[in-house]
Amino acid sequence: MLENIRDAVRKFLTGSTPYEKAVDEFVKELQKSLISSDVNVKLVFSLTAKIKERLNKEKPPSVLERKEWFISIVYDELSKLFGGDKEPNVNPTKLPFIIMLVGVQGSGKTTTSGKLAYFYKRRGYKVGLVAADVYRPAAYDQLLQLGNQIGVPVYGEPNNQNAIEIAKKGVDTFVKNKMDIIIVDTAGRHGYGEETKLLEEMKEIYEALKPDDVILVIDASIGQKAYDLASRFHQASPIGSIIITKMDGTAKGGGALSAVAATGATIKFIGTGEKIDELEIFNAKRYVSRILGMGDIESILEKVKGLEEYEKIQKKMEDVMEGKGKLTLRDVYAQIMALRKMGPLSKVLQHIPGLGVMLPTPSEDQLKLGEEKIRRWLAALNSMTYKELENPSIIDKSRMRRIAEGSGLEVEDVRELLEWYNNMNKLLKMVKRRRGSIDKLFGGKIG
């Protein structure tokens, strides 16, 4: 799946096929690749319908070529398919923090317990593992081996068949030993199709332990079948989250991810390999970047991000012109950085309406700030303190000398930046006064 879509992106961006035909071919390849990854057919066609709808309704930003804009829409909609902007919180909300892992037989739950313990140990937490899977004979030995490998203590009672009793004793022991995070590996005796029994058992252990987090472990190879299990789990345990394992060993990973995301459940981690450190926090946008080929779309995403940041600053400029708030050198810095992300300044400035108002300068054409001047100004801004950026009026000759020395510039460079900043504020006040005069002339505000 990943390779096919990545190749399609590269072909689309570099090929000479006419735009409309290239879009149709790409959409067909996207549908084919997603369906072969076991993504639900309805979800696939809903996705491509949304892409086409946006293509027809929206106008491409001036800083993006049409093909770049199309790929940015594909990226956005695919990200929504796999969970959108939801960023899972992996930090414990209290200490000790008790995590209970559940999952059907063969899901990779015990291995994931070890990976999770290693993840938190690397972050500086004291971690303990509780082996409460009493139905699989090798579960305790496997967890003990993992614990020894990563230097994490394991509590277990190989001759005790009471999972709840073991779990409670293990948690109590680690609480007394002042462990920060306690991970309980519960039984995985039920197979897929026996979700009801699994969830009933989960509730029993939950009531006994009152854990702070319940995590369901799902094998990616079940593809879209993950929907039923994730849906029931999400309804039974709203505080719970999900780990999808074995993403590296199946073509159905996309199907499992999209199915779980469709339930509204939070995907916290994905397992990306067999090694103990191959567990990563799930981020839908990062995952989609990988699918589309990070090298091919990185510059597009950078331009889109720059445009979004620029529009935020532009909104603030408009507020200042309306007399709301003030513009600081911190805003100027953010504006320049946003423009740099959108491409070469000489090209970007030509495509931004009203930039003469946004970036006025007394000595050059308002639409063409030189790269060298921008470089010097950024160096000066980087050498200023927080107070100086927020309140430039405090910058006297002594501060100018310090800023110049810290940035490798002349004092005149710093003075020029401050003059430009002051002229910009004067211009904004003029615009505000002119707007006020027009409002009075017409008896009120005009849109």
From Swiss-Prot:
It is found in: Cytoplasm. One of its GO terms (molecular function) is ATP hydrolysis activity. GTP binds at residues 103-110, 185-189, 245-248. Its EC number is 3.6.5.4. It catalyses: GTP + H2O = GDP + phosphate + H(+). It comes from the Archaea. One of its GO terms (cellular component) is signal recognition particle. SMART domains: AAA, SRP54, SRP54_N. It is an enzyme of class 3 (hydrolase). Part of the signal recognition particle protein translocation system, which is composed of SRP and FtsY. Archaeal SRP consists of a 7S RNA molecule of 300 nucleotides and two protein subunits: SRP54 and SRP19. This is Signal recognition particle 54 kDa protein. The gene is srp54.
